[in-house]
């Protein structure tokens, strides 16, 4: 039995004829099994995702047709692009700049997404690549736009897409590099700032869970010479950002994709995180609950988990259930920093 598909995919189902016989490239916010239907319609299908969780869910079915990375290159080989609108406009611009050099002249440009998610800015997004797109459909509070690649495209330069800023956490100064859509892409967020001010000195091995642009792990690596740092995230854009942040600061660390603990082996002396949280998205909360509940399995004897969270989130009961001791080591009206020991 197939899983339910999103409202955007239900709208696309009404427009299947647009994709028949195409050499189709799909990217953006993918969240269901709909690409399996596209595989039956298109003459060839390539699905590019920066989301490791989604990649794992589809890889067994789509096989070589699905790719997980921060970048896709090569010669022009597609005659249609379907971009499912990301939450961040800058990420949509990044994907279009990356994918259009892979399209043949005259290729179809399809943009689909929820009306509340920025899809109605399709005109401006597609302006560098062709004439004003046509709105093909509007259903279930979603819209589908259709344009054509009629303007010359410039080669994609990955380095041009990194934002750069200097941040200071206590006495530790850091240069941060981040791709569009990555958490802490433009500045050090207040939660991470509080976490880094509260965390004690560290030795041994550290896991930075949900590393984003690599700020937390990099600050702790710089502050604690000899600390072995591993950073994990589900976002390929975050992982590449973390690699760049480590490198530009002359720091060492391992960076890898993991869906919670899917690809983690061994035990750590410290796990530190500003866990992903987005109001109203139960999937993020469930992933964080799993992360907290299973953390003791990945901590060495006397190991500790340090997290920062919005003050209204009820993480303390979860921590107290799975750890011998949990203390709030810093707090204000917005955030709490918890230190839990096995």
From Swiss-Prot:
Annotated Gene Ontology cellular component terms: cytoplasm
Entry-linked SUPFAM superfamilies: S-adenosyl-L-methionine-dependent methyltransferases (SSF53335)
Gene3D superfamilies: Vaccinia Virus protein VP39 (3.40.50.150)
CDD domains: AdoMet_MTases (cd02440)
EC number per UniProt: 2.1.1.172
InterPro entries from the UniProt entry: DNA_methylase_N6_adenine_CS, Mtase_sm_N, rRNA_ssu_MeTfrase_C, RsmC/RlmG, SAM-dependent_MTases_sf, Small_mtfrase_dom
Main location: cytoplasm
Top EC class of this enzyme: transferase
Catalytic activity: guanosine(1207) in 16S rRNA + S-adenosyl-L-methionine = N(2)-methylguanosine(1207) in 16S rRNA + S-adenosyl-L-homocysteine + H(+)
Localization: Cytoplasm
Record's keyword terms, sorted: Cytoplasm, Methyltransferase, rRNA processing, S-adenosyl-L-methionine, Transferase
GO molecular function: 16S rRNA (guanine(1207)-N(2))-methyltransferase activity; nucleic acid binding
Transmembrane segments: none
UniProt xrefs under PANTHER family: RIBOSOMAL RNA SMALL SUBUNIT METHYLTRANSFERASE C
Family from the record: Belongs to the methyltransferase superfamily. RsmC family.
Role, per record: Specifically methylates the guanine in position 1207 of 16S rRNA in the 30S particle.
Classification via NCBIfam families: PRK09489.1
Assembly notes: Monomer.
This protein's name: Ribosomal RNA small subunit methyltransferase C
């Amino acid at each position: 039995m197939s899983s339910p598909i999103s409202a955007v995919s239900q709208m696309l189902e009404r427009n299947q004829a647009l994709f028949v016989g195409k050499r189709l490239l799909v990217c953006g916010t993918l969240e269901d099994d709909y690409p399996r239907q596209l595989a039956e319609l298109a003459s060839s299908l390539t699905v590019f995702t920066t989301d490791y969780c989604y990649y794992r869910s589809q890889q067994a079915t789509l096989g070589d047709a699905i790719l997980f990375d921060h970048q896709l290159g090569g010669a022009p080989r597609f005659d249609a692009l379907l971009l499912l609108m990301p939450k961040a406009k800058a990420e949509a611009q990044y994907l279009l700049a990356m994918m259009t050099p892979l399209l043949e002249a005259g290729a179809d440009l399809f943009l689909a997404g929820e009306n509340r998610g920025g899809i109605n800015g399709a005109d401006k997004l597609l302006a560098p690549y062709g004439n004003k797109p046509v709105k093909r459909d509007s259903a279930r509070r979603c819209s589908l736009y259709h344009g054509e690649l009629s303007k010359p495209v410039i080669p994609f330069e990955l380095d041009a897409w990194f934002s750069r800023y200097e941040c200071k956490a206590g006495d530790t100064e850091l240069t941060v590099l981040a791709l569009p859509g990555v958490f802490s892409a433009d500045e050090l967020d207040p939660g991470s700032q509080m976490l880094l001010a509260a965390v004690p000195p560290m030795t041994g091995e550290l896991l930075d869970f949900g590393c984003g642009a690599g700020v937390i792990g990099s600050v702790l690596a710089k502050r604690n010479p000899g600390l072995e740092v591993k950073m994990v995230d589900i976002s390929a854009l975050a992982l590449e950002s973390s690699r760049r942040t480590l490198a530009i600061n002359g720091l060492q660390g391992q960076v890898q994709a993991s869906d919670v603990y899917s690809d983690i082996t061994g035990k750590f002396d410290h796990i530190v995180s500003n866990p992903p949280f987005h109001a109203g998205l139960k999937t993020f909360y469930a992933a964080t609950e799993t992360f907290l509940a299973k953390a003791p399995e990945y901590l060495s004897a006397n190991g500790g988990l340090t997290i920062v969270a919005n003050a209204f989130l009820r993480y303390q009961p979860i921590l107290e259930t799975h750890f011998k001791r949990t203390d709030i080591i810093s707090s204000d009206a917005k955030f709490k920093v918890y230190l839990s020991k096995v």
